[in-house]
C-alpha cells in the first residue's frame, strides 16, 4: 500500500505547479509526466487518442494502486478545455491534481482514504489544438482548428493582427456620422453618441475591428468563421445537424476520443466538466433517469455551496454544459 512518506525532495520538486499562468500543450504534458513519474503508485499517465493536429489528449488516472486497480473502484471523471478559450478549465484540472497530491503527501486522511477506495480520471485539455492556437496567436475560436464549414478561408472581412502587436484590436476612425464620442470623464474612453449630439466642433468616431478583406467586392461583408466546429456539438446523444456540429457525430477525433474514453470506463459514477461560461453549476438534461437526478441534485448543491455559482436546470434542447 502506498505511503505519503515515500516521497523524496526531488519528487516533491517534480510535483510543483506554477499557478497564475496559462500553460501551453507541452507545459501541460510536462506537468502530467512529472506527476506520474514522481508518484507512480498514485498516478498513471495515458492517452485517449490524438487531436486533429496530432497532439496527445492525455488522461491522468489517480488511485492508490496498492489497494487495487482503478478499474475495480468507483470512479469520478473530470475534464476541462472543451472549447479553445476555456483554458481556465485546464488550469482547474491541473490545480486539482496538484492539490490532491500535496494533501496526500501531507497525510490528509480524507484524501488518503479517497485514493484508496476510489479512482479519479482527469483530462485537462480536450481540445489541445484549439487551446494552443488561442494561447499562442491573437485569434479566438470555438474549439477545433479544422476549417469548417469551408475548406479554405471564406471571402469577406477577416480579423487579423495587421501591425504585429500580438493582438487583434479595435480601430478608432474619425467619422462625422460616427456612433461614438469621447467621454467627458476620461478622454481615453469612447461612449455611445446620443441622438441629440450634433456639435460641429466635436469629433465623432466609428469603431472598426483590425483586419483585412479577402476578395473584397465593395460591400461590407464579414466572412463566416474559419473554425466553426464545436467539440461539444459532436457527441451522439441528441445530435442534430447544425453548422457547428459537423457532418456527423464524433467526426472530430477529440470528441471521439472522449466518447470512447468514457464508454470504456464503466466504473465511472459521475462526471464534472469545467467550462468557463455563465458562473453556473449545471446538472444534466431533464431526460436523465429520476434516480440519477437525485444524486446530481446533491452534487450540484455541493458545487453551488463551494463556488457560490447559481444552479441551472438544463432543458432537453441544449447540450450538456454548453
Task: Kindly give the residue locations of the regions a language model identified.
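Short glycine- and acidic-rich boundary segments immediately preceding or forming the N-terminal edge
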Residues: 2-57
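Short HxH-centered metal-ligating active-site micro-motif
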Residues: 54, 74-96, 125, 274-275
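Solvent-exposed loop/turn segments at secondary-structure junctions
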Residues: 52, 65-67, 82-87, 126-131, ...
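Flexible, small-residue-rich helix->loop connector segments that border functional cores
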Residues: 97-116
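Surface-exposed loop and adjacent secondary-structure segments within mature catalytic domains
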Residues: 3-8, 49-51, 113-243
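Acidic/His- and Gly-rich active-site-bordering loop/insert found
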Residues: 56-78
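Short, solvent-exposed loop/turn and secondary-structure capping segments
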Residues: 70-74, 87-91, 132-138, 146, ...
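Metallocarboxypeptidase
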Residues: 44-45, 56, 119-123, 129, ...
